[in-house]
């Protein structure tokens, strides 16, 4: 087991920590909200009485976006976030660490089998609220979700940007942030990724979202990008 030499909070990403190991390598991590719990087999680091979970960029598109130079991490302590396509909770668990017990993640997932996996994660993570539903129809879970500070989407649907806009109009406050992981091949297998990205960005802009940054996630995820935007009502 590689020993931890030091842990410090990242200069720009609040709630994200840089772990230095004795072999000289650096890893990013979040402080574990549920000490002792692993979510996806990630490494656990212990230092000065605290426990940190390695944030694996090959398993989490948000971690990949940070390592690829996303201008900022808008997620912060106490935030309320709507997560579309939460799946089994890999990325959401790190967001859960960052927002802490005062924050809340409303996690929408369409697949019952995947939802069962998520339920094992949220049993101890009281700030994640799972919703079995279809992100295309936000009106069907409107009664379960309060207004949110942020929206994160990873739904791999052909109309992903339109789905995001629909949900943003329902739930995202003015000035709230949106992070959308986009896989070009899930939207249109016949079109080059750059053209797909442009088309989806136009849909977001037409829906009132001001684009702040777009980063491509190679080599962590081929043909993926992360779009960061802010809602302007």
From Swiss-Prot:
Pfam families: Fibrillarin. S-adenosyl-L-methionine binds at residues 90-91, 109-110, 134-135, 154-157. One of its GO terms (molecular function) is RNA binding. Its EC number is 2.1.1.-. SUPFAM superfamilies: S-adenosyl-L-methionine-dependent methyltransferases (SSF53335). Coiled coil: none annotated. Interacts with nop5. Component of box C/D small ribonucleoprotein (sRNP) particles that contain rpl7ae, FlpA and nop5, plus a guide RNA. Belongs to the methyltransferase superfamily. Fibrillarin family. This is Fibrillarin-like rRNA/tRNA 2'-O-methyltransferase. The lineage of its organism: Archaea, Thermoproteota, Thermoprotei, Desulfurococcales, Desulfurococcaceae.
């Amino acid at each position: 087991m590689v020993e931890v030499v030091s842990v410090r909070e990242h200069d720009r990403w609040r709630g994200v920590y840089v772990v230095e190991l004795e072999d000289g390598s650096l890893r990013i991590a979040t402080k574990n909200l549920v000490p002792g719990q692993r979510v996806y087999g990630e490494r656990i680091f212990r230092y000065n009485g605290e426990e940190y979970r390695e944030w694996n960029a090959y398993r989490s598109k948000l971690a990949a976006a940070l390592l690829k130079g996303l201008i900022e991490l808008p997620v912060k302590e106490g935030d309320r976030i709507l997560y579309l396509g939460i799946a089994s909770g890999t990325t959401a668990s790190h967001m859960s660490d960052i927002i802490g017990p005062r924050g809340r993640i409303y996690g929408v997932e369409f697949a019952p089998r995947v939802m069962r996996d998520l339920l094992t994660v949220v049993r101890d993570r009281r700030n994640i609220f799972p919703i079995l539903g279809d992100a295309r129809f936000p009106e069907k879970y409107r009664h379960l979700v309060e207004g949110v500070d942020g929206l994160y989407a990873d739904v791999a649907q052909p109309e992903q940007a339109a789905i995001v806009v629909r949900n943003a109009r329902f739930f995202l406050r003015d000035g709230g942030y949106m992070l959308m992981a986009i896989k070009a091949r899930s939207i249109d297998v016949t079109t080059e990724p750059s053209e797909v990205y442009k088309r989806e960005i136009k849909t977001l802009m037409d829906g009132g979202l001001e684009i702040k940054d777009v980063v491509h996630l190679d080599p962590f995820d081929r043909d993926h990008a992360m779009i960061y935007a802010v809602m302007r009502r």
